[in-house]
Amino acid sequence: MNKKVCSFPILFALLALVVGTCAVVFPASAQAAPTSTGSITVSGTVASSYDAYQIFSANVVDGDSDAKIATDLAWASDAARDAALPVLHSAGMPKSQTTVQEAAEWLNTDSHLTSALSAQLARFLQSSGAVFVALNAGTAAELHCGYWLIVADDDAIAQGEVGTAPIMALVGGSAVTVKPKAATPKVAKHVLEDSIAAWQKAADATVADDLYWRLSATVPAGLTAYDTYTVQFVDTMGAGLDSSKVAASMRVYVAAGADGGFDAVSTGKDGRAGTEPAKGWTDITSQCATKVAADGKTFTVRTGDLIAALGGADAFTAGARVVAVYNAPLNSACNHGIAKGNPNEVYLRYPRSPFADQSGDAGFTRTPSDDACAYTWDLALTKRGSDGDKPLAGAVLSIADDRGRTLAADGTWDAEGKATVTTGEDGRVTVSGVDSGKLEVREPKAPKGYTAFEGTRSVTVKAEGLDVDQVAAAKPKLTVTAESPLRADSADGSTGSLEASLINTPAGTPPSITTGGFMPSTGDMAMFTAAAVAVVGAALIVVALLVKRGGGSHKE
């Protein structure tokens, strides 16, 4: 048996924080007699259980400065030797070197024991049938002295956890604690708010208009133990969203590095997202698979190998960002108002560990879910007479949105801007499922016996409080304002219902005098009272002047 002392200063620092285990050094003084077993504890929350494979057996004692000294190295088993040598030879160790001492010294030279090499070594050990010892996280276990490769048990990796690169630990002497470090992928969802061309957690939109959603994933840096890396977005849409355009509109992009934003494509105030990737982003749509469930409620987007998409392991070492953009408009069954909204939820499936089978679903675990929400509103416009505020039927109105489309009788929008609507017996016209913004109203024809107003007047729906960090924090405030002779009456954010009136004067009534512009209305009648008082006051002054003038003439 080889009596040399073996030193492995890099076996621990590179792969994990090892409390109570430091570099192995040559002894400078007499040491305590070695024992046959040592205690090890795997702490942290990476996984709940681990498999420990012994590579080398050794006599281990504590040295100075918390170092450990290993002597009398030997292969722990034939299976360990047969699994390790091919891996080391393929990694660059001369094929003429086959002894345990040569293998140990090569591993300790020039930091050969990388996380990628340790992962490959673990794969060979797992496939060789080598015997392992099961370890429970947080519980001390007694192992034979020597070098052990600690591998997270894939079956014990739960939601929000991830297996790390294997950890090489020297067991013996004083108790050893190892703490695997792992960062898990993250996922987020946003929806495009067209009024400011920005991705937000909440937005409002017109029913049936294109509505773009963005899924974004962050793959952390340092995942060097993986040969391939695939992620899968799993999206669940509310009943108020139309899934028919998802597959055709889906675009997927990737960028190197875990740090940075997610602006993979341009956005416009027309409510559309571009398709050309921004600088630093690569379109990988052709490498991805989108599958929409038959019921249209869920769909998945599975990427190809992100390591290959980024050009290799060196680029992937810094992590990655993945963005998926798709179109899912609000449909006719959507919720109106803020009481429920129309939520859209996503979570990310990612490989359990470097050893997981990524060909199916079993090798993946998942992140917590994230969501975004879309809202829409209803505006009821009632035609009323100034003589008693009674509803008027038969008014022909042109109602145009901020894209130049006009409302048609069936509730759709005419892109040519030629459609009109006519008020019914209740005097009402309802703009159902509309985005916030300005609507322009014209009156081509007034009801019989009434005078139509000239020109165009606007009614503005405003939704504030949509730009929030989380959907749960969204408390949109809904208001309506209008230009005379339109009048804003009420706004109920919970139901999304807004009320406004259009006031007509009877034919033959002198038009009211305006002094520039149109007075905005919020439903407060005080301004009308003030205006009436002013008119009455002006009339009294005129009468007084006439009386005075008339009296003078009589006197002459």
Residue ranges and their predicted role:
Residues 1-556:
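Solvent-exposed loop/turn and edge beta-strand elements of beta-rich ligand-binding domains
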